[in-house]
Amino acid sequence: MTDATYDKVTMFGADWCRDCRRSKALLDRLGVDHDYVDVEADPSAADRAEAISGRKNIPVVVLPDGRHLVEPSDAELQAALTASGVV
């Protein structure tokens, strides 16, 4: 869990990251209202993502309940979204 508060699903990623593109595509396909934060366009966002996850890996997906996932598979992400009531 993270101490950061997000009103909706927030994903930290980068365009060059294959896992980021895959996770973002799943969020889009499921119709999840989410914010996408590009860590390349906003260098401070990379620091925020690392502070949340404790790792430098992306994507970092933060759920409104404070839970976060790092490099989730589609199945893991969809299960977390369902468990948190997002979908």
Where are these regions (language model features)?
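Non-catalytic, surface beta->alpha helical segment in thiol-disulfide oxidoreductase systems
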Residues: L63-V87
